[in-house]
Curated annotation (Swiss-Prot):
InterPro entries: Doublecortin_dom, Doublecortin_dom_sf, Kinase-like_dom_sf, Prot_kinase_dom, Protein_kinase_ATP_BS, Ser/Thr_kinase_AS. Pfam families: DCX (PF03607), Pkinase (PF00069). Its EC number is 2.7.11.1. This is Serine/threonine-protein kinase GM11705. It catalyses: L-seryl-[protein] + ATP = O-phospho-L-seryl-[protein] + ADP + H(+); L-threonyl-[protein] + ATP = O-phospho-L-threonyl-[protein] + ADP + H(+). It comes from Drosophila sechellia (Fruit fly). One of its GO terms (biological process) is intracellular signal transduction. One of its GO terms (molecular function) is protein serine kinase activity. ATP binds at residues 479-487, 502.
Length: 744
C-alpha cells in the first residue's frame, strides 16, 4: 500500500480545489491493514524521505532565483505557505493509521495526480476533502523566467580626512546609482555637510593606506575610505574604525535620517562652532532642559571661547627645543580632545600622541578655554616624565625664537618716523568725465552717432558691437579702463536698469587668451550677493563682450581717495562682505589672485556711507587643483609665498584682504617703499614685519589689530582662512561691542 505524508494546504493557494464526495478507491477494495507499529514506522520513514525531497526542491528554487521576489508576489506567498506547512509537519502532519481528532472519522490517503494530493474521509458523514499544497516544481514553473538578478550595491564607509573622532557614514554605492565619480563627490559633500563642517567640496577619495581612488571600480564592498576636500593631502591618523557608523544613510531618506540622528550626534573636529547668539546644539535628552548640565556647559564653553587664534607650541625634547605655531579655529577646536589632536599632528612627538599641555609658567591646561585665554605659548608632552624644575625654563635661543614670532603678532602702536606713507598709484585709469558732459547728453545727434562717438574715442567701430547687445542696451559713459579691457555703463532699453559692459581686446591678450576663458568660465559658476554677476557673454574674433552687474558707487580705491580712512564700523561692513565672497569662492576651490581696492565695487547711501561691497574682475581667477606657481597680482597686495615662488593656494586672497583692511583704517598700506620701488617693497613683504604707527592707529582698537595680524601672517599654514575672518570676534561684533581684551 502506497503511503504519503499529508500536508494541509493554505487557503491562500490559488490552485486549491475541492475533491468530489466519492468513495475512495482504497475503500472499495479491501486490503490487509498493517499493524499499528508497522504503520507508524513506515510513516516515519516516508516522512523523512519527503522532508529531504522538499529541502532539495527549496535549494533548487533558491539557485534559480538569485534575486528575491517581492514579498507581495503571489508565487512567493505560495512558497512561504509551503515552507510553513513543511516546518510544522513534524507536529501537525496526519499519520496514516491514526485519527487526528480534528475531522469526523478516520482518513485515508490517496494520490490523485502528480501535482495535487487530496485528503478524503472514510465515512459518508465526513466533510469535504481538502487539497494538499502544490509542489515546489509547480511553483517554479509559475515564476517568470525573464527575471534577471541585479548587481548588489556596495556598502562603503567614508571618513573625513584627518578627523579621528568622526565615526563616518555608510552609504550604498553602485554604478546604477552613480553614473560618474563626480556624482559620488557631490553626494558625499552633501552628506558630510549634514554631520561635520567641511572646508569645501569633496574632491578626492583615498583608501585607508593613502592611495588615491580614481574610479568607482576601485571601491570594494565593506571597506572604508577617506574623503578629502579642496585637494588636501591624505592624513594618516587612527580613524574611528571601531565605532558604530553614525548613520547608514541612503540617498532617498538621508534628510530624515539626519534629522532623526542629529539629536545624539557627537562633536566632530571639523564641525563649525556656533556663533554667539546662536541656538545651542541639541542634546541627547531632546532639549536643553532635559540634557546633562555638564554637556550643556561644555557646549556653552565652546560657543563663547573658541575663536580663531595662533598659538606657539614648544615640543618636548632635548634643548634647544623645536618651536612651531598652530592656527586654532572652530573647525579644529570644537573640544579639548580635538585641540590635542591638532597639536599632535603639528609637533609629531616621538612618544606618539600629546597627552599633557602646560602654559609657559608651568600651569597645566585642562580646559578648552585655557587655549583661548591670555597665554599663547604652550609646552606639549606625551607620556614622558616632566622635570618641572628644568623643562619650563627657556634657553636663550628659545627665547629669541619666541620673540621673533611675537614680533609678527605685535599690535601695539609705534611712533611714525617721517611723513605719512601714501597710497600706491591706481593701477587703472578712468576716462575724464567729458564723455558724460551735459552738452553731450543734450546733443540732438542720433543715438547711433552717440554710440559711434563713444566707441571711436576708444578706437572701436559701432559695427563691431554685437547686434544683441546693440539692440538691447543703450551705451553710456566709460567708467573704467584696464590693461586689456574697457568698461562702459549701459542701460537696458525696456527695463531701464543699468549694467556694465566690459569689452576685452583679444589683440592685447596674445598668448594670454586662457585668462579670458578662465574669467568667463569662473563667473558663469558664481552666484553670490557680494560678487558681481555675469549677465551675458558674447565671444567674437577680435573682442570678448561681458554684460555685468552695475554698482553705482564706483570702486573702493576712489572711495578711499575721497575719505582717506574709514571708521571701524564701516570697515567691519566691508570686511564682512569681502570675507563672505572669499569664503564662497574658496569653498568652490577658486582663488581670485587680484583682490585690491580697484576690484572692489561699493554701494553708498546719500551720506557717502558704504552699504554694500562686491568683488569684481575675475581676469586672474582660476580653480586650485594643486599648488600654483605663476607670479601675478598687484605688488602692494601680493603675498610672500608668491614672491618666494614656493607655491601658493587660496590664502593669498586672505593676505590681500588683510592689506585692504589695514588701508581702510589708516589710509596707507602696511608695506611701503620709497618712490614705489618694487625691490625694497618685496623685501618688506617677505619679512612680514610691519607696524601700527601712531598717531594714525592711536584711536583704533586691539580687536581689529589682532585680526589684521592674523591675516598678514607670512607663513600661510598659520594664516587665517576666509572663514576665520568671519569667525573673529571683531568681525562678529558691532559698534557697541568693541571692548574685547586681546592679550599677546
Amino acid at each position: 500500500m502506497e503511503l504519503e505524508k499529508v500536508k494541509i494546504n493554505s487557503l491562500h493557494c490559488n490552485d486549491a480545489v475541492l475533491s468530489s464526495h466519492q468513495p475512495s478507491p482504497s475503500a472499495t477494495h479491501p486490503q490487509s491493514v498493517p499493524s499499528k507499529a508497522n504503520a507508524v514506522t513506515e510513516a516515519s520513514i516516508i516522512e523523512k524521505t519527503n522532508l529531504q525531497h522538499n529541502v532539495q526542491e527549496d535549494n533548487s528554487y533558491n539557485r534559480d532565483c538569485d534575486s528575491p521576489v517581492s514579498s507581495s508576489s503571489e508565487p512567493e506567498k505560495e512558497l512561504d505557505d509551503l515552507r510553513y506547512l513543511h516546518s510544522s509537519s513534524l507536529t501537525n502532519s496526519v499519520v496514516v493509521g491514526k485519527s487526528t481528532g480534528s475531522l469526523n472519522g478516520a482518513y485515508s490517503i490517496t494520490s490523485v495526480t502528480s501535482k495535487t494530493k487530496t485528503l478524503e474521509p472514510n465515512s459518508a458523514s465526513g466533510s469535504a476533502c481538502l487539497t494538499i499544497a502544490p509542489t515546489a516544481d509547480h511553483i517554479k514553473k509559475r515564476i517568470p523566467s525573464s527575471r534577471t538578478p541585479t548587481r548588489k550595491a556596495l556598502r562603503i564607509k567614508f571618513y573625513r580626512n584627518g578627523d579621528r573622532f568622526y565615526p563616518g557614514i555608510t552609504i550604498p554605492v553602485s554604478n546604477e546609482r552613480y553614473r560618474s565619480f563626480e556624482r559620488l563627490f557631490e553626494d558625499l559633500t552633501r552628506l558630510l555637510e549634514e554631520n561635520v563642517k567641511i572646508p569645501g567640496a569633496v574632491r578626492t577619495i583615498y583608501n585607508m593606506c593613502g592611495k588615491k581612488i580614481t574610479s568607482l571600480d576601485e571601491l570594494e564592498d565593506g571597506q572604508s575610505y577617506v574623503c578629502s576636500c579642496n585637494n588636501e593631502n591624505f592624513k594618516k591618523v587612527e580613524y574611528n574604525t571601531g565605532s558604530q557608523p553614525l548613520s547608514n544613510l541612503t540617498l532617498t531618506n538621508s534628510r530624515s535620517n539626519s534629522h532623526r540622528l542629529a539629536k545624539c550626534r557627537p562633536s566632530s573636529p571639523l564641525k563649525n562652532g556656533l556663533l554667539a547668539g546662536s541656538n545651542p546644539l541639541p542634546t541627547c535628552g531632546g532639549g536643553t532642559g532635559n540634557g546633562s548640565p555638564h554637556i550643556a556647559s561644555r557646549s556653552s564653553d565652546r560657543v563663547t571661547v573658541v575663536h580663531p587664534r595662533i598659538v606657539t607650541l614648544i615640543r618636548s625634547g632635548t634643548k634647544p627645543r623645536r618651536i612651531m605655531r598652530l592656527l586654532l579655529n572652530k573647525r579644529n577646536s570644537p573640544s579639548f580632545d580635538h585641540v590635542l589632536t591638532a597639536i599632535t599632528q603639528v609637533v609629531r612627538l616621538d612618544t606618539g600622541y600629546v597627552r599633557k599641555v602646560f602654559t609657559l609658567s608651568g600651569v597645566s591646561v585642562v580646559r578648552l578655554s585655557d587655549f583661548f585665554g591670555s597665554d599663547d605659548v604652550f609646552f606639549a608632552y606625551g607620556t614622558e616624565r616632566i622635570n618641572t624644575a628644568e623643562d619650563f625654563k627657556l634657553e636663550a635661543e628659545e627665547h629669541r625664537a619666541i620673540n621673533v614670532i611675537r614680533k609678527t603678532m605685535r599690535t601695539t602702536g609705534t611712533t611714525c618716523k617721517g611723513p605719512k606713507p601714501k597710497m600706491p598709484i591706481k593701477s587703472k585709469k578712468v576716462y575724464p568725465p567729458v564723455v558724460d558732459s551735459e552738452a553731450f547728453k543734450a546733443a540732438t545727434t542720433p543715438e547711433d552717432d552717440r554710440h559711434a562717438a563713444l566707441l571711436t574715442s576708444t578706437g572701436m567701430e559701432i559695427n563691431e558691437l554685437p547686434s544683441n547687445i546693440r539692440n538691447t542696451y543703450t551705451l553710456g559713459r566709460i567708467i573704467g579702463d584696464g590693461n586689456f579691457a574697457i568698461v562702459f555703463k549701459i542701460k537696458h532699453r525696456q527695463t531701464g536698469h543699468s549694467y556694465a559692459l566690459k569689452i576685452i581686446d583679444k589683440n592685447k591678450c596674445k598668448g594670454k587668451e586662457h585668462y579670458i576663458d578662465a574669467e568667463v568660465r569662473v563667473m558663469k559658476k558664481l552666484n553670490h550677493p557680494h560678487i558681481i554677476s555675469l549677465i551675458l557673454s558674447v565671444d567674437q574674433n577680435t573682442n570678448m563682450y561681458l554684460v555685468l552687474e552695475y554698482v553705482s558707487g564706483g570702486d573702493l580705491f576712489d572711495a578711499i581717495t575721497q575719505v582717506t580712512r574709514f571708521s571701524e564700523s564701516q570697515s567691519r561692513i566691508m570686511i564682512r562682505h569681502l570675507g563672505a565672497a572669499m569664503t564662497y569662492l574658496h569653498s568652490m576651490g577658486i582663488v581670485h589672485r587680484d583682490i585690491k581696492p580697484e576690484n572692489l565695487l561699493v554701494k553708498l547711501d546719500e551720506h557717502g556711507h558704504v552699504l554694500e561691497l562686491k568683488l569684481a574682475d575675475f581676469g586672474l581667477a582660476c580653480e586650485v587643483n594643486d599648488l600654483l606657481y605663476a607670479v601675478c597680482g598687484t605688488p602692494t597686495y601680493v603675498a610672500p609665498e608668491i614672491l618666494l615662488e614656493v607655491g601658493y593656494g587660496l590664502k593669498i586672497d586672505v593676505w590681500a584682504a588683510g592689506i585692504i583692511l589695514y588701508i581702510l583704517l589708516c589710509g596707507f598700506p602696511p608695506f611701503v617703499a620709497p618712490d614705489n620701488q618694487q625691490e625694497p617693497l618685496f623685501d618688506a613683504i617677505i619679512s612680514g614685519i610691519y607696524e601700527f604707527p601712531d598717531p594714525y592707529w592711536s584711536d583704533i582698537g586691539d580687536g581689529v589689530r589682532d585680526l589684521i595680524a592674523n591675516m598678514l601672517q607670512a607663513d600661510p599654514d598659520v594664516r587665517f582662512t576666509s572663514e576665520d575672518i568671519l569667525d573673529h570676534p571683531w568681525t562678529i561684533g558691532n559698534q557697541g561691542n568693541e571692548c574685547t581684551t586681546y592679550k599677546r
